[in-house]
């Protein structure tokens, strides 16, 4: 049966199964969802078996369970290891959603729900393509699946799992659908990812919250100090001021900068889409360079003092911030973590105590476009979308990708189908049904060309 016909005939069941996953609020960042993590893993194992896997196991790790499945068609054939994650980001702020984030809806040709794209929807694309190949006796490669439940919190348990199960995870290439394209009519393959380093900063002043009238002006305010510290991490030209930060940053080759410059990009449309009047970033680089192949610093959250209704004249005892740096290949996140912490402690005034706690991180990654699996993915996109995909670096991070290369010795092809408008990590996450269908077609074509 031709793939388009297969999708049309089976789509109601496909969506029913996908929705059964989405309805499970597998939020790894919240301990109260511990049972949901197991439920989601078990549901995935069941769906892998139904799709045609020989076996599907829910395996223990140091954290949330890991789903492993496989179908071996020939011990001498090539093996593809499909990686995905079943955990999702918290849905807050809930009031900004147009529908229940964990009760999927189809509106205007899109599936709307938390995880519709990242990563339940995209990983489902992989599994449905696999299912089609199995049922139509077209699968000529061995396929293994590893689905984790901690990607959104930095994959703290996956490296040790890979170390313990190297033989089980042995493969020729890893295939991942957890990245995005440049546009619905502009398919692209991700050839690089930025790394990540993440910290929490705690600033402590007096031993208790104080009356701002009695003590204001005489005692350092931790929130004021925290803001001052953060303001010194970048300069007016958007460069990070941490000593040694740029030591291992590889300058983008001119040939790659020229390629980036040829990518269709409407800056006015970009600003309009996110409702900002002007853009800002490191001087000397374009917007597409800044958010893909240059490092960056961001404050992800900041809090302290009184934030309830009305007013309370208080000089708070503590202030906190969660901050992160996106890193580029060759920057070691452990080294950057140390440099950053040392710098923050060095510039902190004596009037407060400062604690910098590293959270999670990971290395950047680059995929060579000469890789046979990459070229098979190119053919997949060309078949499904009608045009050859552009090769682009993306600004996001999937820390485990570099770990796979280090621990398992396997390269990864990032065959993602997301769009910026899919609003991952934000309210009203969605995925267009048209892209969902084309994604299945593209992955099928990948397997037909990777033998």
Region spans (language model):
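An extended, acidic, His-containing surface patch that forms the Zn2+-binding/catalytic region
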Residues: 50, 183-184, 241-318, 329-342, ...
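Active-site metal-coordination/substrate-binding segment of hydrolases
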Residues: 77-144, 438
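Acidic, glycine-rich active-site loops and adjacent beta-strand->loop/helix elements
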Residues: 86-88, 110, 146-155, 177-181, ...
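Acidic/histidine-rich catalytic neighborhood of metal-dependent amide-processing enzymes
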Residues: 117-192
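Flexible glycine/proline-rich, aromatic-decorated loop/lid segments
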Residues: 188-204, 413
